[in-house]
């Protein structure tokens, strides 16, 4: 179920403050965040966020196409190594 339109997009307040400070100073440092639930806003375009995936901060460079999506969509939390190879077929 999607979020109600009248509520507007959710963004953690500290994330907006950090992004505004980065834009004002012109610095291109990675902004670390644990807020995977926050929506990517238009003023975040061009900034680099370090989105936490449970182990480390994955660098996410925000582009125009990402606006409206969540930060968590760009930092996968699970690593699928693939299915185990068939040992019988490998021996031949």
UniProtKB/Swiss-Prot annotation:
One function term, GO molecular function aspect: structural constituent of ribosome
Keywords in alphabetical order: Ribonucleoprotein, Ribosomal protein, RNA-binding, rRNA-binding
Source species, domain of life: Bacteria
Pfam family, one: Ribosomal_S19
Gene3D superfamilies assigned to the protein according to its UniProt record, in alphabetical order: 30s Ribosomal Protein S19, Chain A
One example of a Gene Ontology biological process annotation: ribosomal small subunit assembly
GO cellular component: cytoplasm; small ribosomal subunit
Family: Belongs to the universal ribosomal protein uS19 family.
PANTHER family found in the cross-reference section: RIBOSOMAL PROTEIN S19P FAMILY MEMBER (PTHR11880), SMALL RIBOSOMAL SUBUNIT PROTEIN US19M (PTHR11880:SF8)
Purpose of the protein: Protein S19 forms a complex with S13 that binds strongly to the 16S ribosomal RNA.
NCBIfam families from the UniProt entry: rpsS_bact
HAMAP family the UniProt entry points to: Ribosomal_uS19 (MF_00531)
Protein name: Small ribosomal subunit protein uS19
Species: Caulobacter sp. (strain K31)
